Amino acid sequence: LGEAIGDAFLPVLKFQHRDVIDLFLPLETGFHNLAIVSSKNRYPRQGRKTALGLLGAGQMMFLKTIVAVNPEHDTKDLDLLLDALDSKVEISEDLVILPGMVADSLAHASPWENIHDKLLIDATSPIEGDPRYLRAPLGGCPDSLEVSASGIDGIVQARMLRSSMLVVTTDIEGGPSPSENVETDDEEGARRQREKICSIRDSIWNLEGASNLRWLFITDSDVDLSDDSWKRVLLWQFFCRFDVGRDLHFDSDRRRVCWDATAPIPSQGGPLPVRRWPGVTLHDPEVLARVDTWLQEGGL
């Protein structure tokens, strides 16, 4: 329903924002955590201008992350999105962070209610007149990096998404359960979580062949990277669990980014606070069983 509403109102949005070619807000990201916009690209950085305009467009002001892509890009093809992030995004140049902006009240990962940082990713092709126009093609990593990363202590699974993009899963001791709300702070658990993420990040970045690993995603092991649904689950984890100001970690040259998408443990003692963390589903198993029985009896 949400995606249908987005398609229905797209003509109105394009009339108000003439640079917009297409727009997609994926269901898996709750509609307010990610937008993919294809923009006209007639002059340098037009995609960024388009994205910034949308961040001031009514309820789109609640967006956490917006990715600008080329005019011909199919915004609903998530494989094409990975291709664009891999081949067109230089971390030091093409990630724009807007600190202290308006957040959705349902953005539970934000450090303060209704306030968070926003992320604009420019995945458009540089055109003539842009200093990036003549830059060399962005390099990647050897396939063997996936095997090397799998052997690091604390990593459950590892998978290369693209040549510059690796996702790993891990178990966080005391991390929030998908079935329960976490209402109280756990300073020691949050400290262990931060230390584990830093340890995994540094271990991977120090691997041979990891110099061009521009994107490192770390998430919980409740996603199976060998399952058919892994892409859809990752999309939710990557964009709903992280906070731009708290969970993006850059290397010293700002050429690589580590994206922490593990479920945050509530605390006040870190660089930025973590608020209460809601369960993903709170349905009583007995109630679910009764509903299933009722549906079966009704032939539904």
Range-by-range predicted roles:
Residues 1-300:
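Charged, compositionally biased interaction regions
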